[in-house]
Amino acid sequence: MPLSRLIVKQFRNIEACDIQPSSGFNFLIGANGSGKTSVLEAVYLLGHGRSFKSSLSGRIIQNECSELFVHGRFMTSDQFELPIGINKQRDGTTEVKISGQTGQKLAQLAQVLPLQLIHPEGFDLLTDGPKHRRAFIDWGVFHSESGFYDAWGRVKRLNKQRNALLKTATHYRELSYWDQELARLAESISQWRATYVEQLKEVAEEICATFLPEFEIKINYYRGWDKDTPYAEILEKNFERDQQLGYTFSGPNKADLKIKVNGTPVEDVLSRGQLKLMVCALRVAQGQHLTQMTGKQCIYLIDDFASELDSQRRARLAECLKATQAQVFVSSITADQIADMHDENSRMFHVEHGKIEQG
């Protein structure tokens, strides 16, 4: 479901742009600071309701402007052109419009415009804490299980209530009512996540083997508590410890994706270039799995394509992305870095001082 038109106004250094992207590869060529990453950021905002570089609306709205606009049109699977848009104010107020209707939720944007982002800071998926890998898992579960979004929101609220009660409760029975519902939802979320990871593993390990054939890569899911013990028992058994800590130690909020290379944690073995290839492999695998399960196509956003990758690795990634037949936006400093990826269906956009021109 590619974007057929992208309109950006008052976004960072982009005063206004209106482009018609290819359904295949789209190359954004320009010097550092030219605005090419801002185009990717605008597409990301359109699908997520937030920037991948800043959580503050004021930092992405153009200086001396009170708001920004990003609008797009994309082709649905039945060849219907669907308009979507987002408007952000400096105070953080956000308005989402889908098919002409205002008041839509950010989650609905994510449903209609699934995106995968690969950028220079993307190593955190593999090298930082488990929250990044939980977000990776939950992106897939969100798109495959209709009940996940509401259930996960409820779990986070129940956890917050439980943590507050831990500070005042004198006996476990004061928490048992809340814990029944928390345990029920946590078990459902854990099962959804486990099922998703099991399905994704086959695709991901195959692509990882293509990108990094010299390594044996294994991916496993950790649910956040002992796999042989019901969560309700964990909550009751750990009541006193949780009280001492002041928060709920075990649960779906501690889930993780364990990735090992030749039996060793991935961050202890791979170089930066190899880590980037693995991140790319995981993102592409997630997009392919989405297509297999739902028929939806991801849009891939790749910032600073050449970073950490030699020409051979770039060619390997380009070949894999072309095989997905998905829409891809790629930023690069020079056209030489993406020359091998260019074909008759791709489009090149030159970016300079926030001005975008097709060329």
Swiss-Prot record:
User: What is its subcellular localisation?
Assistant: Cytoplasm
Q: Which InterPro entries match?
A: DNA-binding_RecF (IPR001238), DNA-binding_RecF_CS (IPR018078), P-loop_NTPase (IPR027417), RecF/RecN/SMC_N (IPR003395), RecF_2 (IPR042174)
Disulfide pairings: none
Chain residues that bind ATP: 30-37
Q: List the keywords (alphabetical).
A: ATP-binding, Cytoplasm, DNA damage, DNA repair, DNA replication, DNA-binding, Nucleotide-binding, SOS response
Q: What is its main location?
A: cytoplasm
What's the name of the protein? DNA replication and repair protein RecF
From what organism does this protein derive?
Vibrio atlanticus (strain LGP32)
